[in-house]
Amino acid sequence: MAKTLAEKVWDAHVVRKGDGAGANAQPDLLFIDLHLVHEVTSPQAFEGLRLAGRPLRRPDLTIATEDHNTPTLDIDKPIADLTSRTQIQTLRNNCAEFGVRLHSLGDAEQGIVHVVGPQLGLTQPGMTVVCGDSHTSTHGAFGALAMGIGTSEVEHVMATQTLSLKPFKTMAINVEGTLRPGVTAKDIILAVIAKIGTGGGQGYVLEYRGSAIRALSMDARMTICNMSIEAGARAGMVAPDETTYAYMQGRPHAPEGADWDAAVEYWNTLKTDDDATFDVEVDLDADTLEPFVTWGTNPGQGVSLSQAVPSPEDFGDENAKAAAERALQYMGLEAGTPMKDIRVDTVFLGSCTNSRIEDLRAAADIIRGREKDPKVRMLVVPGSARVRLEAEAEGLDRVFKDFGAEWRFAGCSMCLGMNPDQLEPGERCASTSNRNFEGRQGKGGRTHLVSPVVAAATAVRGTLSSPSDLDPAPASAAIRTDAA
């Protein structure tokens, strides 16, 4: 029987088969290969184990890092916020008690959990990966079936190394063509979400396919899979290939020698069969894609940067019209305003979507030798301590500092309002993160989701801008099209 990539990985992990479809059907029981843990969604799960007198079933398949609440300045000092400090210390205590490997603040491998897993070679093709975080879909870039789970499910995986799930439907996102200079993976996924909506992928695993996807680097593929959840999907995947293997080989937890050869032989089978059928297929033309930016308060409210803020009257559906009216009011925007006329106060380069080394390189290439708009504050937050060290070895930190940007330590930072890096009410931010909800970056903060190169160009001009808007514009060869 012909199978999709998602179906192959799913079937390989079924411990106990359910009893079919339907609302009352029993789910399948899946084995979980890798469980990623952080400080926010794990305390209750560890406490559940403790109260039940249960051990952690597989400490060797569990890894923790501190990311959501960690400060990105003065990391050698006590954390000022009591709640954040308590959550961090609780994670440390729990990991010590249950034997979980932990990368703490100050550790060379500390960072955002979805950056740390891949960089250590823990995330591998064909795996099932879970974490108490919705952006676990990031790891699907390796051909893994990776899902965010709730705290009760976190406890279940800790206790049993399994998870009960009903099979998902499958959706192919076919992206053919060649991206133009200044158009990146972030623009692909923002365009996908704008096309199918924030609920279009509900109940599906999305598989990203086509020539434009195959041309992308692993960092870029992770950007796309990361935001699958913003389309409502449970997971996003890309079939592994030579690009995947080149990224993985030599990483600390990647197979070696004969084990590597055997692994690659298996990984090469992890592709959708030619005669397999998806439940839904969506097509996107990479040749015509432009830099994308959100104007509203959900990731589906986006347009090409060359366009204007839409009018609520442009939406035929009454619910969409009402949502647009509320979004415009919250964002302080008027319909018809050219997106490139919108001035920002802050530019944030970071998050599990766009904080990897290629993201930093791409942004640095745009700003090198230029001056920052004096009214704009720019924060650059590497996704991990390892990425930070790599960037500093390449001199990227000096490029950002010379430009006038703040060079920070690793963490989730301004992606979400759970640490000191937050927007003030009414402050407008061009952000490389994944969510632009009301208050996401701080109470009353206004967020526009953009790619790293758009973020960099915006920091130069002070208004939402693409690299081609700069004077002089960067040479086409200097703008990466395979990056995130």
From Swiss-Prot:
Record Pfam families: Aconitase
Name of the top EC class for this enzyme: lyase
Biased composition range(s): Low complexity: 464-478
Pathway, per record: Amino-acid biosynthesis; L-leucine biosynthesis; L-leucine from 3-methyl-2-oxobutanoate: step 2/4
Keywords assigned: 4Fe-4S, Amino-acid biosynthesis, Branched-chain amino acid biosynthesis, Iron, Iron-sulfur, Leucine biosynthesis, Lyase, Metal-binding
One biological process term in Gene Ontology: L-leucine biosynthetic process
Catalytic activity: (2R,3S)-3-isopropylmalate = (2S)-2-isopropylmalate
A GO molecular-function descriptor: metal ion binding
PROSITE patterns, sorted: ACONITASE_1, ACONITASE_2
List of residues binding [4Fe-4S] cluster: C352, C412, C415
InterPro entries xref list: 3-IsopropMal_deHydase_lsu, Acnase/IPM_dHydase_lsu_aba_1/3, Acoase/IPM_deHydtase_lsu_aba, Aconitase_4Fe-4S_BS, Aconitase_4Fe-4S_dom, IPM_dehydratase_rel_enz, IPMI_cat
CDD domains per the UniProt record, alphabetical: IPMI
Textual note on the cofactor: Binds 1 [4Fe-4S] cluster per subunit.
Region: Disordered, residue numbers: 463-484
Cofactor annotation: [4Fe-4S] cluster
This enzyme's EC code(s): 4.2.1.33
Entry similarity comment: Belongs to the aconitase/IPM isomerase family. LeuC type 1 subfamily.
Subunit architecture: Heterodimer of LeuC and LeuD.
Classification via HAMAP family: LeuC_type1
Function text: Catalyzes the isomerization between 2-isopropylmalate and 3-isopropylmalate, via the formation of 2-isopropylmaleate.
Full protein name: 3-isopropylmalate dehydratase large subunit
Organism per entry: Pseudarthrobacter chlorophenolicus (strain ATCC 700700 / DSM 12829 / CIP 107037 / JCM 12360 / KCTC 9906 / NCIMB 13794 / A6) (Arthrobacter chlorophenolicus)
